[in-house]
Structure formats: structure tokens, C-alpha cells
Amino acid sequence: KDKENCIGKHHECTDDRDSCCKGKLFRYQCQCFKVIDGKKETKRCACVTPLHYKMAEMAVSVFKKMFKN
């Protein structure tokens, strides 16, 4: 999807799991969680940066800083 119609980071993507926006390097992924509210259990999803993507972004950032000079 284009930038204007994608779902931003930390926004709900329960009904449209393939529409997360692109982050710095990678597209956010729709991650789902079980929410228990009283006796009712529902599934809620949000666009997030997975841990391995965060680590890759950090490595690229460190690499750029090392070779900036």
C-alpha cells in the first residue's frame, strides 16, 4: 500500500494485517496479542518493529557512525 493509506507504528492492524507502513529500513509487522477483559478474550493486533529488525537497524546505525569520518 502507499504511504498515505498504510497503518502507522503502534496503530491497530487487526482487520488489515498486511497494511503496516515502512519504518527506517523495514516494513513494520502486524503483531497480535490476546487481550483478556473480564471474562472475554479478544485478539488485538498492532504494527510494530520486530526485535530482529530493531537489532539490524541498530547495527546499521553503528556501522554508519564508524565510517562517517
From Swiss-Prot:
Which cysteines share a disulfide bond? C6-C21, C13-C30, C20-C47, C32-C45
Tissue-specificity statement: Expressed by the venom gland.
Keyword field:
Amidation, Calcium channel impairing toxin, Cytolysis, Disulfide bond, Ion channel impairing toxin, Knottin, Membrane, Neurotoxin, Secreted, Target cell membrane, Target membrane, Toxin, Voltage-gated calcium channel impairing toxin
| The keyword Cell wall biogenesis/degradation is annotated on this UniProt entry | no
Signal peptide positions (record): none
Task: Check the record and name the InterPro entries matching this protein.
Answer: Spider_toxin_CSTX_knottin, Spider_toxin_CSTX_Knottin_CS
**Where does it sit, as one GO cellular component term?**
other organism cell membrane
Q: Which GO terms describe its biological process?
A: killing of cells of another organism
Give the matching PROSITE patterns: SPIDER_CSTX
Quote one Gene Ontology molecular function term: toxin activity
Pfam families per record: Toxin_35
Any notes on this protein's domains?
The presence of a 'disulfide through disulfide knot' structurally defines this protein as a knottin.
Function, as annotated, reads: Spider venom toxin that shows calcium channel blocking activity and exhibits cytolytic activity by affecting the outer leaflet curvature and/or pore formation across the membrane. It blocks L-type calcium channels (Cav1/CACNA1) in mammalian neurons at nanomolar concentrations. Furthermore, it produces a slow voltage-independent block of mid/low and high voltage-activated calcium channels in cockroach neurons. Potassium ions, histamine, M-ctenitoxin-Cs1a (AC P83619), CSTX-9 (AC P58604), and CSTX-13 (AC P83919) synergistically increase the insecticidal activity of this toxin.
Q: What is this protein called?
A: Toxin CSTX-11
Organism for this UniProt entry = Cupiennius salei
**Taxonomic placement:** Eukaryota, Metazoa, Ecdysozoa, Arthropoda, Chelicerata
